[in-house]
Amino acid sequence: MSEDYRGHHGITGLATKAIHAGYRPDPATGAVNVPIYASSTFAQDGVGELRGGFEYARTGNPMRAALEASLATVEEGVFARAFSSGMAASDCALRVMLRPGDHVIIPDDVYGGTFRLIDKVFTQWNVDYTPVPLSDLDAVRAAITSRTRLIWVETPTNPLLSIADITSIGELGKKHSVKVLVDNTFASPALQQPLMLGADVVLHSTTKYIGGHSDVVGGALVTNDEELDQAFGFLQNGAGAVPSPFDAYLTMRGLKTLVLRMQRHNENAITVAEFLAGHPSVSAVLYPGLPSHPGHEVAARQMRGFGGMVSLRMRAGRLAAQDLCARTKVFTLAESLGGVESLIEQPSAMTHASTTGSQLEVPDDLVRLSVGIEDVGDLLCDLKQALN
């Protein structure tokens, strides 16, 4: 077993870190990958004398420890906690960072699952929230009250791909003693590292780009704040929403190719966005890589690429959006995102149905594309036939 769970020293390249951080070849066997420790419990040398710090798999597992070290390293963080899903990570963060009577600011187009958790669960515990367009710093500033404890940031947002200035919001948070959490799922650490920009916590649904193959569900919290990490760890263990060793293995395997995959996602997405922007059936294309996007300059400053997510609005409305989703052959009609295969969905009826009737309701003419890493010519041909 390797004793190195905190990454390699002296390595600066992100692609190299993603491959090597968290584990070195096993000194006994030479295995270059972390073994999958399918054990629920671990033998002790004496009462309370743990081997390598492991006692029970909910509390810790060598495979999960390696994944957490890798995630911390690629986000330029000190601490990371892995969870069984992105929503489990979200729930942990909210329970640690908020108390009854507190107030949280959220994006006015926040992910539907996050909205449902806050609106249906945390409001029962007397937690208030205010949806705000986070691209408008004056609106964020105006929403802060004496009870505000957290600003929940998505950038780019899901599904409208709005951009928030992480550095400016981080400065605002510090000025008012408000923590800033950034959901970095859409960008991934390959394109954006929020801790380096002033965020206190980074959240991931590792199901998406980090896992990258649509074969595992997971989540993560990364921070440089030891007190927060200890609180996250307490709930991770106490509530028990942890990934299995095999899920941790799949996630870590996906992480190794993240940088390479994101390069192709970026290339394909900008090509798709430019094609859609010129199509008469499309009234608007939402993609931060287009110079016409209102957040383009901020995205170019804080990201190393614009990502693989593209949203569009159909000129003929809801039924046209449904028809487009039904007609594609290469783009699969499915929820989720970030895998190697291209996906298409209508958020108002699928991933964001929980926002219907609320301030966060998603337009029903909106279609969201998760642009995969296939040959871009095939993707364009598929969209052409579906639109025509």
Swiss-Prot record:
**GO molecular function per UniProt:** cystathionine gamma-lyase activity; cystathionine gamma-synthase activity; pyridoxal phosphate binding
Annotated Gene Ontology cellular component terms: cytoplasm
Listed A to Z, the keywords are: Amino-acid biosynthesis, Cytoplasm, Methionine biosynthesis, Pyridoxal phosphate, Transferase
**Positions of modified residues (N6-(pyridoxal phosphate)lysine):** 208
Q: Could you tell me what reaction this enzyme catalyses?
A: O-succinyl-L-homoserine + L-cysteine = L,L-cystathionine + succinate + H(+)
- Which top EC class applies here? transferase
Transmembrane helix as a keyword? Answer: no
**One Gene Ontology term from the biological process aspect of the record:** cysteine biosynthetic process via cystathionine
Instruction: Give the Enzyme Commission number.
Output: 2.5.1.48
Q: Which cofactor does it need?
A: pyridoxal 5'-phosphate
Classification via InterPro entries: Cys/Met-Metab_PyrdxlP-dep_enz, Cys_met_metab_PP, PyrdxlP-dep_Trfase, PyrdxlP-dep_Trfase_major, PyrdxlP-dep_Trfase_small
Q: Which CDD domains match?
A: CGS_like (cd00614)
A Pfam family annotated for this chain is: Cys_Met_Meta_PP
Q: Where in the cell is it found?
A: Cytoplasm
What does the record note about the cofactor? Binds 1 pyridoxal phosphate per subunit.
Q: Which family does it belong to?
A: Belongs to the trans-sulfuration enzymes family.
Its function, per the record, reads: Catalyzes the formation of L-cystathionine from O-succinyl-L-homoserine (OSHS) and L-cysteine, via a gamma-replacement reaction. In the absence of thiol, catalyzes gamma-elimination to form 2-oxobutanoate, succinate and ammonia.
Q: How does it assemble?
A: Homotetramer.
Report the NCBIfam families cross-referenced here: PRK07811.1
In its UniProt entry, what is this protein called?
Answer: Cystathionine gamma-synthase
Q: What is the lineage of its organism?
A: Bacteria, Bacillati, Actinomycetota, Actinomycetes, Mycobacteriales
